[in-house]
């Protein structure tokens, strides 16, 4: 009887370890989602929404979401919280299926296939403010960069960003990786 008890206890521990191990392995990044957990595919119209920072412009984000056709919105950032989720999902008056904020704070996380898939499945992408140097150093030449370019060039969904998120959306960008520059310096030698 004692042998049977230990066998059952061992199986229970093994089952717990497997379940816990799979749970821990299931998501190795931070994200928050509001709205439907079911992915939808909607008809979208491409567009770029560039905002300089500070207070978000409701009309600009509404314009972006109207182009998303009621689909899923992904918000990318390298630090912070889910501050955009409720605002974008329920305070703008433009229905979307869901809003998910994903924190990508390392190059390793920018290589997670599940994150790239979530980005590729989005009908709108918004890149929050922060530090554009971290966006460049974490995302450049990774599946996240490929997924963002796929949304813009192939799927043609609306993409927007504010502050640092705006700064990295062009073909040429100011990364602020090595130092900063004043307006007077930049205007005196814009091609340096």
Residue ranges and their predicted role:
Residues 7-8, 111-112, 141-142:
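Polar helix-capping/helix-linker motif
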């Amino acid at each position: 009887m004692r042998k049977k008890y230990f066998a059952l206890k061992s199986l229970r521990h093994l089952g717990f370890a497997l379940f816990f191990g799979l749970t821990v392995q299931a998501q190795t990044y931070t994200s928050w989602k509001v709205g439907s957990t079911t992915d939808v595919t909607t008809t979208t119209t491409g567009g770029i929404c560039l905002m300089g920072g500070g207070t978000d412009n409701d009309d600009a984000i509404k314009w972006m979401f109207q182009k998303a056709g009621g689909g899923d919105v992904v918000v990318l950032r390298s630090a912070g919280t889910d501050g955009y989720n409720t605002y974008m999902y329920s305070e703008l008056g433009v229905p979307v299926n869901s809003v998910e904020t994903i924190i990508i704070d390392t190059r390793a996380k920018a290589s997670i296939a599940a994150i790239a898939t979530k980005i590729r499945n989005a009908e709108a992408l918004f890149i929050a403010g922060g530090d554009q140097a971290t966006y460049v150093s974490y995302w450049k030449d990774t599946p996240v960069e490929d997924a963002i370019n796929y949304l813009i060039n192939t799927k043609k969904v609306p993409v927007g960003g504010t502050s640092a998120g705006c700064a990295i959306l062009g073909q040429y960008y100011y990364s602020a990786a090595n130092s900063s520059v004043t307006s007077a310096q930049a205007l005196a030698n814009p091609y340096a």
